[in-house]
Amino acid sequence: MPRRREVPKRDVLPDPKFGSVELSKFMNVVMIDGKKAVAERIVYGALAQVEKKTGKNPIEVFSTAIANAKPVVEVKSRRVGGANYQVPVEVRPARRLALAMRWLREAARKRGEKSMDLRLAGELLDAAEGRGGAMKKRDEVHRMAEANKAFSHFRF
């Protein structure tokens, strides 16, 4: 138990262009070394590409991609009697969002397109359609949880 008082969570302000808090959080995930302007340029560029390629509302595509990439369960290590068990646990909503955003970013970075906004646009489109690196990561985490279902009685 911490001795100090609990520090309140800081609210993230919605982004100026679309008024979305989720998008603002994603910009913070993409940001490197505090360069917010660069992160904004990348994310807005990616959304412009998405709109150009699909003709759909880019925020809807973004929301669908995030929703598809969110994990439902994950495994946590639990030591019981000298053995480590991978125990499947449900993921809290805030962590679901954070993991989905992180996985989208990492999958985009590993892609082959020239610039980051093109990579991110490609990954968002793939995730919205249920494929791509972020979806592969989510399925891998779900498979691990499914394989270790027998240890679910060791819940935390």
From Swiss-Prot:
GO terms for biological process: translation. The keyword 4Fe-4S does not apply. GO terms for cellular component: small ribosomal subunit. GO terms for molecular function: rRNA binding; structural constituent of ribosome; tRNA binding. The keyword Protein biosynthesis does not apply. It comes from the Bacteria. InterPro entries: Ribosomal_uS7, Ribosomal_uS7_bac/org-type, Ribosomal_uS7_CS, Ribosomal_uS7_dom, Ribosomal_uS7_dom_sf. Keywords: Ribonucleoprotein, Ribosomal protein, RNA-binding, rRNA-binding, tRNA-binding. It holds the Pfam family Ribosomal_S7. Part of the 30S ribosomal subunit. Contacts proteins S9 and S11. One of the primary rRNA binding proteins, it binds directly to 16S rRNA where it nucleates assembly of the head domain of the 30S subunit. Is located at the subunit interface close to the decoding center, probably blocks exit of the E-site tRNA. Belongs to the universal ribosomal protein uS7 family. NCBIfam families: rpsG_bact. This is Small ribosomal subunit protein uS7. It comes from Laribacter hongkongensis (strain HLHK9).
